[in-house]
């Protein structure tokens, strides 16, 4: 165990005090938020205020790899609801993400969840059917083709699903949206006693996922629908709501967001603090009162550079596979230095935060 009660250098502490930036709120946007959810938000605010960042890793098998090879365990585990999407279940997808989340939470870890939401339509396009419908000028549904196989159905290019049209409550697709939200609610309900950093509709402004393909307004409307249905209809009061874009045009509003975040996949060798992205998120809410996080990273930012620049990310979550295991994005020497840093919290250092 490394020294975990960080005392900020006087100059750094003075910089935080005199920065003019408001302390992030510890009050969740859901007024019925559970006690564990409130405790989690308060813990995140407290640790960020101390100048520390929580380490995080996407997928349990990769978090275990970090433990075995780096020598420390990440605080945060990221899992994906992707294969609980009804359209993917219909095609035979099976997921253990909820079981993985329960396992890690039992060890004292914090859970964050994203959702690569599989396109909602029942209309799967084979190569032959797509060719026929393109001839008629009316393709519809997921392109389950050689070029775009079914498992890519969260990508814009793999589906003709139109969110703008689907947000009409009288449409068939709106009913499918509600069906999917309700199906995901069943899975999230299994975590009802575990606080969750829920990060839906991520990277929307990029347009590469269908939920961002028709612009900001339909996406914001879908996010608000998710919030209302999961909190009010399903009573999922264990969720803290994480927005994932730095573009003001896409922001759904302070009343729907507990944490603002962005995903950053920097060039190889770039372990900078990502100050520009941090400052953009600072200005996003208008009042500087939200926690700021890195929802996904390819390259882990150097904690010393974060401190020097004043980019106080509450947490970061490294993406899975070669992003964490390989030497190109995060060399082993660098990984070990980051996890050993007194500026970075690891799993052993946050035990008991939810008491």
UniProtKB/Swiss-Prot annotation:
It is found in: Secreted. Residues 35-348 form the GH26 domain. It catalyses: Random hydrolysis of (1->4)-beta-D-mannosidic linkages in mannans, galactomannans and glucomannans. It comes from the Eukaryota. Keywords: Carbohydrate metabolism, Glycoprotein, Glycosidase, Hydrolase, Secreted, Signal. GO terms for molecular function: mannan endo-1,4-beta-mannosidase activity. Substrate binds at residues 208, 265. The keyword ATP-binding does not apply. GO terms for cellular component: extracellular region. The active site is at 203 (proton donor), 296 (nucleophile). InterPro entries: GH26_dom, Glyco_hydro_26, Glycoside_hydrolase_SF, MANB/E. Residues 1-22 form the signal peptide. One of its GO terms (biological process) is substituted mannan metabolic process. Glycans are attached at residues 50, 144, 162, 287. Its EC number is 3.2.1.78. The keyword Secreted applies. Belongs to the glycosyl hydrolase 26 family. Endo-1,4-mannanase, a crucial enzyme for depolymerization of seed galactomannans and wood galactoglucomannans. This is Probable mannan endo-1,4-beta-mannosidase E. It comes from Emericella nidulans (strain FGSC A4 / ATCC 38163 / CBS 112.46 / NRRL 194 / M139). The lineage of its organism: Eukaryota, Fungi, Dikarya, Ascomycota, Pezizomycotina.
